[in-house]
Amino acid sequence: MKTIIAEKPSVAREIARIVGATKREEGYFEGGGYAVTWAFGHLVQLAMPDGYGIRGFVRDNLPVIPDTFTLVPRQVKTEKGYKPDSGVVTQIKTVTRLFKESEQIIVATDAGREGELIFRYLYHYTGCATPFVRLWISSLTDKAIREGLRNLEAGGKYDDLYLAAKARSESDWLVGINGTQALSIAAGHGTYSVGRVQTPTLAMVCARYWENRRFTPEAFCQLHIATDGCDEGTVKFSSSEKWKEKEPATELYNKVKSAGTATVTKAERKEKTEETPLLYDLTTLQKEANTKHGFTAEQTLEIAQKLYEKKLITYPRTGSRYIPEDVFAEIPKLLAFIGALPEWKGKVQPKAVPTRRSVDGSKVTDHHALLVTGEKPLFLSKEDNTVYQMVAGRMIEAFSEKCVKDTATVTAECAGVEFTVKGSVIRQAGWRAVYGEEDKEETAIPGWREGDTLTLKGCSITEGKTKPKPLHTEATLLSAMETAGKDIEDDALRQALKDCGIGTPATRAAIIETLFKRGYMERCKKSLVPTEKGLALYSVVKTMRIADVAMTGEWEKNLARIERGELPADTFCKEIEAYTKEITSELLSCDKLFARRDSGCKCPKCGTGSMQFYGKVVRCDNADCGLPVFRLKANRTLSDDEIKELLTDGHTKPLKGFKSKQGKSFDAIVAFDGDYNTTFVFPERKTSRKFSGRKK
């Protein structure tokens, strides 16, 4: 008998059908000489510190660096600590028996770093010695599964992939466990979760937040002139210079207005070619789904995974935007399939030769770029269909012709002031016709030449203010994670740097969600805004190595080198252990940043503890309560007296100087709600508000 192990029951069911394992047993399918079982994610994980006899957060125990990591069944948190999940334990027993009764194991977990780790951890935990081979496929269509089963690969081929996954898992454990315990011990209150990837990610969100909030707008003035354009239209020039003071701008405006004409000093015309966009990888799909449709990164990943399991798209957790030659041979057939869908009628040219910009086998790692499979997309929800059509539409774009534009840049002088205008006209829409972008308004520039005199139809002066960089959205944060914070727009260059980013396409959504779940940031429409807790953590760690984005990018680069067999995993692990010791010492030493003072106030929630000042937070010293009150509220820090008033009366007096997320100033009362969270009450509504957080 051969045992096939899949990552999920749904995938196991499809494989079982194909190999003839039609008899359903507890935890597996059987038949045709096969047993097909599943793991439903990680059945086995690294033990928590108490698995090594270390309990609680104790300074002298740090850093916790096991000589050998212990594997245990997946744990669930209970009131008495972490316990093995009973359902997981049952499934492990089933898998162990099947492994030992089999002549061969076929590994059909997801074909990637994490899928490999799921199997290898389970294999080592069970103590199994049965030989195994790898089913490595990029889609779950019947055709792909059958071809994969005919071309099984040696299990040892993916040893380096496993070593990279193992190194990632152990490094995350070392940094997360030791960093969290060290910072929490230093703080003396509460739990502050830190991590190898989550903390640098939070640092990028907080740094952008403060850059935005501390930005001082500068006023400027700009001049504009208008003259006759093409087809009875008007062409508007803008001054090359902007003036900080209105007076000189007004003087020049009057001179320009009096002049009545402008002289062309330079006229440049060029043909501009816009290359087709590359196919989607997961991160690019997530970014565009967030920008265009408001989907979260996690939502897009969940939908893409669902579409993959329905056999509609290829493997979603890919970091490549390219396909190899053998897949390119299938593209004409796939494009014909897409062209027959109602959404894309008339968008695919039947006999056109697909362009090759997205074809490069050397840039394909575990999996190629996202493609549709040719299975009909039936009965999809609105959201699922949106993501499916995004993948289909991008395929049409990627294999269409280039877009060709005629561009013009004209410079003119009037009364000593230089004005410029830029325009373009699409000559060949190419890929831009897929979404109708060729119909967007264009600026056609007449055939002016140097020395031509232009009669002014009007002139104007506008006033504006410089703007800060906007707060991060999930799309911009994903971009920053992809390039370790570097601002890079070029798609090809971003791909070249993808090994230096933080996180992987498969993990970035989970990292972002972790920051939400741990209360470090929240969504405000599309923007990501750090909470008081997130800003408090950032203020402590922002100059430390734990928050160093570039260094975290180097770790990811080294993990990719392990995967390619270019770096021994032991070398990486020794470096991570040394780093763990450094950051543990660094975080433990920051207890001075958490200096403690007694507020003199009883806890309004439990009535027994005393509220203690710890820098940016005030917290109850009763371990069973631990009520936190953050000083920073809407860009304003509450004073000691204001905090004491809040703790004593349940609310402050009306306070000035708050600033909204949109940058608008406002006055408000800070009060406790019924759950002792702080909230704003506005003075004009004070009489209708009942304060629920008064002192007991």
Indicate where each model-derived feature is located.
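Intrinsically disordered, low-complexity regulatory segments
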Residues: 1-169, 173, 179, 349, ...
